[in-house]
């Protein structure tokens, strides 16, 4: 890596600040012990900033985000947001960041952790080979399209409206991400839609198929209706390699698939836009939310954030060997019995604090790197 590899840490709300802090310690280990020339910065975001400035995100933070190669983000959310206009949350929160960075692809790897078998609701034989990548379209669909809003009719009734809309270029753009990933993995893509009742779903199916036929004939493509996909994720999750879905379906299915990991605290994610001069700038975050009920207690699971750092090492900083090392260290820490409260499954062993869990990963890194 060059000297210009800039990692920006943004804790955000609730437990986000705690888990990102620990992931930052891991990043510092790679800089100090592995010689990775990382420039690590921090920026404020969320309720802390809101209380000081009346805004969720300042212009300075947005400028730092634009300048970073990779952003490791914690969480946004909490009761304070309930009193804010929805438009302010859209314009100053994650949707603004996604728009500013041109993020359109959200990747969520889902795998089975043998050390957490007791937490997984599936029998091991059904999930032990699960290693899937969920590719979610992030910039379009029902979360963004217009018209939208809550209106009142002439007879006094209230009506809520949202619009599901995709064009061919948006669909092919995200399809290429899935097909490229499949080429480097098992060579299989399963595309999710609701083409039997939605015109947007029919276009999705047609364009994904056309993209595959024209550009990726070597990749196996299957189409599946979203309701059947939800069922198959419960019955045969190991059948999926790369799962491609639109914004809404991808949002829902990725959380459902996360049950394989045993805890939302184990799930990382990455979001990308177009490559910039051969570099893939990324926005990385654990899937779990801000968890205000446990914020400030030092008991949150930092592994989702730490595994998100591994994704940054792999995809933005192009250090796959270092990413593999970090993922093996997480696996080793878990195999050695390291558990935060969400990973105990009723066991008698004491729960580790957020910091102690990160310490267990650091110890595993030292052992594996020796």
UniProtKB/Swiss-Prot annotation:
Binding-site list for substrate: 98, 108, 136, 227
Entry protein name: 3-isopropylmalate dehydrogenase 1
Main subcellular localisation: cytoplasm
One GO BP annotation of this record: L-leucine biosynthetic process
Cofactor annotation: Mg(2+); Mn(2+)
PANTHER family recorded: 3-ISOPROPYLMALATE DEHYDROGENASE
Source organism per UniProt: Bordetella bronchiseptica (strain ATCC BAA-588 / NCTC 13252 / RB50)
This protein's encoding gene: leuB1
Catalytic activity, EC: 1.1.1.85
GO cellular component: cytosol
GO molecular function: 3-isopropylmalate dehydrogenase activity; magnesium ion binding; NAD binding
Enzymatic reactions: (2R,3S)-3-isopropylmalate + NAD(+) = 4-methyl-2-oxopentanoate + CO2 + NADH
UniProt record similarity statement: Belongs to the isocitrate and isopropylmalate dehydrogenases family. LeuB type 1 subfamily.
InterPro entries: IsoCit/isopropylmalate_DH_CS, IsoPropMal-DH-like_dom, Isopropylmalate_DH
Top-level taxon of origin: Bacteria
Binding site for NAD(+): 289-301
Pfam families, alphabetized: Iso_dh
């Amino acid at each position: 890596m060059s000297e210009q590899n800039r990692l920006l840490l943004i804790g955000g709300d609730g437990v986000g600040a705690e888990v990102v802090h620990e992931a930052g310690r891991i990043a510092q280990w790679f800089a100090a012990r592995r010689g990775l020339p990382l420039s690590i910065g921090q920026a404020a975001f969320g309720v802390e900033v809101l209380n000081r400035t009346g805004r969720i995100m300042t212009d300075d933070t947005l400028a730092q985000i634009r300048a970073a190669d990779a952003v490791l983000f914690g969480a946004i959310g909490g009761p304070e947001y309930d009193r804010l206009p929805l438009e302010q949350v859209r314009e100053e929160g994650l949707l603004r960041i996604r728009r500013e960075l041109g993020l359109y692809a959200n990747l969520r790897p889902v795998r089975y952790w043998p050390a957490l078998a007791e937490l997984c609701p599936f029998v091991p034989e059904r999930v032990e080979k699960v290693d899937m990548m969920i590719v979610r379209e992030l910039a379009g669909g029902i979360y963004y399209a217009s018209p939208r809003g809550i209106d009142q009719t002439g007879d006094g009734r209230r009506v809520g409206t949202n619009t599901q809309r995709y064009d061919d270029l948006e669909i092919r753009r995200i399809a290429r991400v899935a097909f490229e990933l499949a080429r480097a993995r098992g060579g299989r893509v399963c595309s999710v839609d609701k083409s039997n009742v939605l015109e947007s779903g029919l276009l999705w199916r047609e364009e994904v198929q056309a993209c595959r036929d024209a550009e990726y004939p070597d990749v196996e493509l299957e189409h599946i209706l979203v309701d059947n996909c939800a069922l198959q994720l419960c019955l045969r999750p190991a059948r999926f390699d790369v799962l491609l879905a639109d914004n809404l379906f991808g949002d829902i299915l990725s959380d459902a698939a996360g049950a394989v990991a045993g805890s939302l605290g184990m799930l990382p994610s990455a979001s990308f836009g177009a490559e910039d001069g051969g570099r893939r700038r990324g926005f990385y975050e654990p899937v779990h939310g801000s968890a205000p009920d446990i914020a400030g207690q030092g008991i949150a699971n930092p592994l989702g954030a730490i595994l998100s750092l591994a994704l940054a090492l792999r995809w933005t900083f192009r250090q796959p060997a270092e990413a593999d090392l970090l993922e093996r260290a997480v696996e080793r820490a878990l195999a050695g019995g390291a558990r935060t409260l969400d990973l105990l499954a009723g066991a008698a062993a004491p729960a580790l604090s957020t910091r102690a869990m990160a310490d267990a990963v650091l110890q595993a890194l030292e052992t594996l790197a020796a």
